[in-house]
Amino acid sequence: MTRSGRPTRRAGLRTVVAALAAVPLIGTAGASAARQESRSRELLRPVPFPPLEVMTFNLRFASAEKPHSWAVRRPVMRTLLHRAAPHVIGTQEGRPQQLLDIGADLGPHYAWIGTSRGVGADEAVAVFYDTRRLAPAGYEHFWLSDTPRVRGSNTWGGGHPRMVTWVRFRDRLAAGRQFCVLNTHLDNASQYARERSAALIAARISRFDPALPLLLTGDFNTVAHENPVYDRLLAAGLVDTWDTARTRGDAYATYHGYKALTPNGGRIDWILATPGVRVQREWTDTFSENGQYPSDHLPVQASLTLG
């Protein structure tokens, strides 16, 4: 019989030692198999994707009007955007040169998609995106009117033509997962126009592939939870990411008009989403420099995963 284990002084223990030496061999084999099974399960488990940073931001159109001219506001906006580092920005009120300025300030890793709401060089609802993270797979513009394909159309009594720009993105860091972003700016003058606009947006949302996560960003010119416009969009199957966020920053009215901020004020700038989108955190960005805000609105940002 071949001896196993280390030598002992007591021959009577040799059998016991041999028996005990055999037990760990069985136990080790079992543990090894368990570890292998655990590793296999780990490999099969879905890899968590990094959060997507999404912002909605009414830029306040560029003008030379003092004291809040674009020349004064632009460097503050540049700093805010660099600090926030969003992957997607749904903007409102951007004018052509202003959008070019913001694109230059964001740097070479950002691009944008947008078009004038009117027939001339007018405001847009441009969507900026970080090209290191996202690639556009399709996009379209439509106008909030009875003739959505007609540029500048305004048939519901609104103060200005209103529109939606939507983009279908492919997430480079999420195995090419696709999702859609719709961005808009509803009318400030007419509740009727806002309600008709919400109904049209809801109808358009119903045409999208339900398997794709969807985000709706915008300045809706109505306070969340307090207007039929909000109710209509939630009835379309969307949720308010401010309400579903796991954690939230301090709440402020998102329009301030360059005056003192209003804690717990009305939110007219929202990020809505399909229910599968999980929001880790959402906040209103109150950044300013020497009392100067980059816009008369506060941007809202959400850190989320697409589910």
Show which residues each predicted segment covers.
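Soluble non-cytosolic domains of exported or imported proteins
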Residues: 67-72, 93-96, 158, 188-196, ...
